[in-house]
From Swiss-Prot:
Residues 28-54 have a biased composition (Low complexity). It comes from the Eukaryota. Residues 1-54 are annotated as: Disordered. This is Putative uncharacterized protein DDB_G0289245. It comes from Dictyostelium discoideum (Social amoeba). The lineage of its organism: Eukaryota, Amoebozoa, Evosea, Eumycetozoa, Dictyostelia.
Amino acid sequence: MSKKSTPMTKDAASRIQSSAAKSGGDVSSGSFASRAQSAAAINANNTSNSTGKK
């Protein structure tokens, strides 16, 4: 059985970062929240480029 991955969205990254900040967690560069935000930005760029949107 293969496992499908779901791309990180801006909304999901925002929820992760907000939750980490509220709980006193790490939101600095290199943290999971930071990496989630970066992945969401990359996915948003890839999606807009592949559909012709800007």
